[in-house]
């Protein structure tokens, strides 16, 4: 028996089926994406390659559903297996490795010390720091380890000053301008903010030309063994992000605005330029930079005396990308 209502329903079925099929097809990339958690340890420009990789869509492009996490305990979460990779300094990961953990740096962003030691106007020389309060991010963090490496060069030790755990860059800027600390190490371009607040540059570490592995991409040997292809694809996205930093200011600045939480165009540009001028297209970690870190650590960690700097890096995946011509092709 002819039934108009039944016919109407039947006409809708193909449309409904097509809609469901289309939704499934569109969902396939996200369903197939590898979930990955990545930590970064500071809001300094040296961490920016990771930010650009996320904002520039390169993580999605390379098959990831990524959770980017800011934490003051980046190395602890990495070693514990709570995250898969981390953006952190060589000194931070070295301390963990020297104490038995298995982090390795697979790409490096900085290979010399670039910080500025910023001080209140009444501090005229390094000797004036004797008995004064110097703020660091936290004990064991890069700002702390670099400071105790530099002080002896000027006849000071960490016992001659009072070291205070203050927090990340914004916290230290507030503490410095407010007078609760007398000096602190700041990465470019954050030292410019300190200058705007009336502080002075007591020491430019870049002038010392010291090989020192700064920020880089770090994972664990466990992760490399279990999910090597995942790490390979992430490194590919990271190298592509470096290319964006070098060639695409618009996307890069968008990433800096998001992660540094500012709309100030001058501050965004200062931070972006600081990274752009530093990062290399082929981000091989510095063996000499790790040698400096290990030699310094030998006074505090006995295992450092026998450590080999080459054990702190794994460039096998980066070499694969390099030899394939992938990196060179990005810049043609």
PLM region descriptions:
Residues 142-157, 161, 237-270, 313, ...:
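Ligand-binding clefts/hinges and TM-proximal coupling segments of bilobed small-molecule sensing domains
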Residues 225-305:
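Secondary-structure end/capping motifs
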Residues 34-178, 182-188, 201-211:
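Short, glycine-/small- and polar/acidic-enriched structural segments
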Residues 1-12:
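N-terminal secretory signal peptides that target proteins for export/translocation
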Residues 90, 121, 188-189, 221, ...:
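Short secondary-structure boundary segments
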Residues 17-29:
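Bacterial N-terminal signal peptides
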Residues 40, 109-119, 197-227, 231, ...:
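Periplasmic-binding protein-like
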Residues 295-332:
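Conserved C-terminal helix/tail region of periplasmic/extracytoplasmic solute-binding proteins
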């Amino acid at each position: 028996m002819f039934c108009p209502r039944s016919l109407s329903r039947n006409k809708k079925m193909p449309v409904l089926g097509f809609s469901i099929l289309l939704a499934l097809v569109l969902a396939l990339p996200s369903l197939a994406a590898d979930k990955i958690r990545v930590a970064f340890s500071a809001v300094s420009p040296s961490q920016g390659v990771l930010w650009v990789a996320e904002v520039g869509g390169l993580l999605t492009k390379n098959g990831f559903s990524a959770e980017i996490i800011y934490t003051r305990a980046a190395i602890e979460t990495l070693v514990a297996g709570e995250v898969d990779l981390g953006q952190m300094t060589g000194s931070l990961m070295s301390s963990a490795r020297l104490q038995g953990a298995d982090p390795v740096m697979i790409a490096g962003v900085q290979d010399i010390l670039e910080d500025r030691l910023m001080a209140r106007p009444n501090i005229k020389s390094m000797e004036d720091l004797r008995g004064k309060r110097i703020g660091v991010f936290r004990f064991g963090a890069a700002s702390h380890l670099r400071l105790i490496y530099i002080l002896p060069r000027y006849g000071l030790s960490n016992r001659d000053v009072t070291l205070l755990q203050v927090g990340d860059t914004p916290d230290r800027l507030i503490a410095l301008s407010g007078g609760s600390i007398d000096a602190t190490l700041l990465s470019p371009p954050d030292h410019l903010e300190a200058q705007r607040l009336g502080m002075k540059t007591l020491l430019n570490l870049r002038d010392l030309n010291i090989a020192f592995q700064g920020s880089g991409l770090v994972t664990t040997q466990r992760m490399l063994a279990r999910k090597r292809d995942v790490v390979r694809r992430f490194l590919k996205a990271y190298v592509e992000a470096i290319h964006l930093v070098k060639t695409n200011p618009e996307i890069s600045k968008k990433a800096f605005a998001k992660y540094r939480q500012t709309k100030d165009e001058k501050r965004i540009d200062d931070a972006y330029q600081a990274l752009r001028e530093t990062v290399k297209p082929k981000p091989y970690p510095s063996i000499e930079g790790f040698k400096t870190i290990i030699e310094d650590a030998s006074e505090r960690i006995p295992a450092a005396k026998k450590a080999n700097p080459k054990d702190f890096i794994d460039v096998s995946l980066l070499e694969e990308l390099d030899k394939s011509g992938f990196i060179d092709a990005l810049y043609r």
